Amino acid sequence: MLVFLHAVFITVLILLLIGRLQLLERLLLNHSFNLKTVNDFNILYRSLAETRLLKVVLRVIFLVLLGFCCYRLLVTLM
């Protein structure tokens, strides 16, 4: 039961992190209007690529933990 609660807690934290990363991505895109040099665009491009990669990794971890939670719940109910 403790393992199940721990997995649920981490799943919720991952969802919150994904939401924060989406907010960060929107803020970075809003600041693209203020960029003046090519170096600024390169930094923005790298930052957006890193946030997108991090979102993908967190979503994969989220799906694995969600599957684990569902499996543990089914085992507990049987």
UniProtKB/Swiss-Prot annotation:
Keywords: Host membrane, Membrane, Signal, Transmembrane, Transmembrane helix. It comes from the Viruses. It is a single-pass membrane protein. The chain crosses the membrane at residues 58-78. Residues 59-65 are annotated as: Interaction with PPP1CC/PP1-gamma. It is found in: Host membrane. Residues 1-23 form the signal peptide. The keyword DNA-binding does not apply. Pfam families: Corona_7 (PF02398). Residues 24-57 are lumenal. GO terms for cellular component: host cell membrane; membrane. The keyword Transmembrane applies. Interacts with serine/threonine-protein phosphatase PPP1CC/PP1-gamma; this interaction; this interaction probably promotes EIF2S1/eIF-2alpha dephosphorylation. Belongs to the coronaviruses ns7/ns7a protein family. Inhibits the integrated stress response (ISR) in the infected cell by promoting EIF2S1/eIF-2alpha dephosphorylation. Acts as a functional homolog of host PPP1R15A/GADD34 to recruit PP1 phosphatase and dephosphorylate host EIF2S1/eIF-2alpha. May function in the formation of membrane-bound replication complexes or in the assembly of the virus. This is Non-structural protein 7. It comes from Porcine transmissible gastroenteritis coronavirus (strain Purdue). The lineage of its organism: Viruses, Riboviria, Orthornavirae, Pisuviricota, Pisoniviricetes.
